[in-house]
């Protein structure tokens, strides 16, 4: 049978409205359902990085065998999630992520901690500086004599440890007050 022109028009309009509604619903579903998870996963992942870097640093300071594998797994996961966040920040309708400056800070702190952990893990330093021995005591109940006469390697080692501690404090500050479901 032949459709009248008004039927065709009605059908076409319906299809267009249906498509537009479908697109809007799709965008909203994506916005409200998939997006927050990437962000939450990133924050949780950053917290795991913090915990495992803390563990690694403790191993280093106590002179134990250092195992970076868990930290590196967490780092890889945080990096992957951060890249997804960056992608989401570039898509339209993502007002929530327009400024991922805090996430960028978190990621760069984790990366800085990572680099320095790699460095000190491979060093054979014998002595703590006064600052590092104080921090080791405060944070890990580690009583370690400090030396005021440090050789070059000890100085470099302590320098990196101090930075790791500083970055870890900054990281903790960034992530601990974020509300995640």
Describe the residue ranges of each PLM region.
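C-terminal ends of transmembrane alpha-helices
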Residues: 7, 29-33, 81-84, 88
């Amino acid at each position: 049978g032949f459709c009248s022109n008004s039927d065709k028009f009605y059908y076409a309009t319906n299809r267009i409205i249906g498509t537009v509604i479908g697109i809007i619903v799709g965008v909203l579903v994506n916005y409200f359902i998939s997006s927050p998870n990437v962000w939450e996963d990133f924050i949780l992942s950053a917290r795991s990085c913090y915990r495992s870097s803390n563990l690694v640093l403790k191993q280093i300071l106590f002179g134990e065998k250092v195992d970076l594998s868990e930290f590196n797994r967490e780092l890889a996961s945080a990096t992957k999630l951060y890249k997804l966040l960056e992608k989401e920040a570039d898509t339209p309708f993502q007002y929530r992520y327009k400024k991922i400056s805090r996430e960028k800070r978190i990621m760069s702190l984790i990366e800085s901690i990572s680099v320095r952990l790699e460095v000190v893990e491979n060093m054979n330093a014998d002595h703590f500086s006064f600052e590092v021995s104080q921090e080791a005591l405060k944070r890990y109940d580690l009583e370690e004599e400090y030396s005021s006469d440090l050789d070059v390697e000890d100085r470099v080692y302590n320098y990196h440890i101090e930075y790791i501690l500083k970055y870890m404090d900054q990281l903790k500050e960034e992530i601990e007050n974020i509300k995640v479901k």
